[in-house]
Design a protein with these regions (language model features):
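Conserved short alpha-helical interface segments
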Residues: 1-19
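Dynamic "connector" segments at or just before major functional cores
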Residues: 18-184, 191-211, 218-223, 227-228, ...
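Acidic, metal-coordinating catalytic cores used for nucleic-acid/nucleotide bond scission
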Residues: 236-245, 264-267
Length: 467
């Protein structure tokens, strides 16, 4: 319009004043996150993230403030507040840091962290840059220390695995690894994870791994466990790609029991084919849900790097090729060995849940050390979900995404006043399970709320209209 008037010789129209402009929604300016501006003045509001407050009793019991003591922080956002805010993103299944902007105005999310407002995407991106591997390891060690009395990590046996997080950028520092989901090698960040076999929770992670260091990562986990628990891991289960035969000999020298697979080389396949039928014996597995419960087994002793190991050929497990198990457990029956290795699928299921719910494959950076902190958050968040699952009747084996869908994803009305914070969960079909968990029986004092207590309640049923 300005150009048309100019061509016709007219002067430009004067700019309208703000009060002359039409009334339409304009961008709002949200406050900057600052713990010093955190207020617990009496007020009421509604939050989309009501289910997050179900984790608060566990965070109080596990003393998150102590866990965050050695982490980086500032006067505006102290270390404990930064850790709670970062955990909130994981617990609420926020895929990328930029997606937090959709919840920037949610007062409930800020209250959970103990801040006046939730930090913005730029803060979360910058915060992980302040972590080195030593600090991330200290966070995991503190998490282990706080979980010692929770019964979640028994430490009897561990499932170990690598996971390659795909990278689609152009950074030359990102190395190529096997990505099992795509059955090919591509640029990716390699992550090592350890899972407690009984508690089904991750207990260790490391994303600061370069090519050539993979075989020794199992010993870094052993050193970590010894430092935090004062003893060596008792039993490890992993696949054939995790380490080398030389490292297996070292494990045997440390008297650590293990079960692993051996790669089916042409010579091994030839030996299996040449075995007479009478050499095989049938065992029955005590797994009622398994289709193939009567595999055939042949056992022998092999020497690798000067150490004797038990080697089991296993057929009729539902695979076209036989399975080759290798172990240093000399007194355990073949049936127990096969059953225990079959339970290694628990870490595969946990990795699937981590990818689908905790968005493990949504790479936060091309820098492995930044990914390292993100994986440590995954370890803590998955542990909190396992602890909550133990409280919920019928959900002890549920994966995080199932628990989130049924239990956590609930809005709530929050009222601050009278010396407490009252979180009134909206009605949902699974609300009776929360009521039966005991979380609503009594209030919990929350340290980062200046001594105020959290009281979880359920919204009353709608009263019938009177006519």
């Amino acid at each position: 319009m300005r150009e048309v008037l100019k061509e016709e010789g007219f002067a430009p129209l004067p700019r309208r004043l703000d009060e002359e402009r039409p009334d339409y929604p304009r961008p709002t300016v949200e406050p900057v996150a600052d713990a010093r501006a955190f207020s617990l003045e009496p007020r009421s509001f509604t939050t989309r993230c009501g289910g997050l407050f179900l984790f608060v009793p566990e965070l109080v019991r596990l003393d998150l403030e102590k866990m965050a003591a050695a982490l980086p922080g500032s006067k505006m956002i102290p270390a404990a507040h930064a850790l709670r805010a970062s955990l909130a993103l994981k617990l609420w299944s926020i895929e990328r840091k930029s997606h937090v902007m959709t919840l920037a105005a949610d007062e409930g999310l800020a209250l959970f962290a103990g801040l006046n407002a939730i930090p913005k995407k730029s803060y979360f991106s910058e915060y992980s840059s302040r972590f080195g591997h030593a600090q991330t390891t200290r966070l995991l060690a503190a998490w282990q220390e706080q979980l010692a009395g929770a019964g979640l990590l028994r430490g009897e046996s561990f499932n170990l695995d690598f996971h390659s997080v795909p990278y689609y950028g152009e950074s030359p520092q990102v190395e190529r690894h096997d990505v099992s989901a795509r059955s090919r090698r591509q640029a990716s960040v390699l992550v090592f994870l350890a899972q407690d076999a009984d508690g089904r929770a991750f207990c260790y992670s490391n994303a600061d791994i370069r090519k050539g260091e993979e075989a020794g990562e199992i010993f870094r986990f052993i050193d970590f466990w010894k430092r935090t628990r004062g003893e060596l891991p008792r039993h490890l289960v992993f696949d054939s790609r995790l380490t080398t035969y030389a490292k297996l000999a070292e494990l045997d020298g440390l008297k650590i029991d293990f079960i692993t697979l051996r790669r089916r080389s042409p010579q091994i396949m030839k030996d299996i084919v040449c075995l007479p039928r009478s050499a095989w014996r049938t065992v029955e597995l005590d797994i009622s849900t398994r289709k193939y419960r009567t595999p055939r087994v042949y056992e022998q002793t092999v020497r690798l790097h000067g150490h004797a190991f038990r080697q089991l050929y296993v057929q009729d497990l539902g695979h076209e090729d036989p399975t080759v198990l290798l172990t240093n457990q000399r007194r355990t029956s073949a049936k127990q060995l096969i059953t225990r290795y079959a339970h290694r699928m628990l870490i595969e299921n946990a990795l699937s849940d981590a990818v689908r719910f905790f968005h493990m494959d949504a790479l936060s950076s091309a820098v492995g050390l930044k990914v390292d902190f993100d994986m440590a958050l995954l370890v803590v968040a998955s542990g909190l979900y396992r602890l909550l699952a133990q409280r919920m009747r019928g959900y002890s084996d549920a994966q995080a995404r199932h628990l989130f869908r049924d239990i956590i994803d609930i809005p709530a009305d929050i009222t601050i006043g009278g010396g407490e914070v009252r979180v009134q969960l909206h009605r949902r079909s699974h609300l009776p399970i929360i009521l039966a968990s005991g979380l609503m029986d009594q209030p919990f004092a929350v340290p980062w709320w200046n001594g105020l207590s959290l009281r979880l309640t359920a919204r009353d049923a709608l009263k019938p209209r009177q006519t």
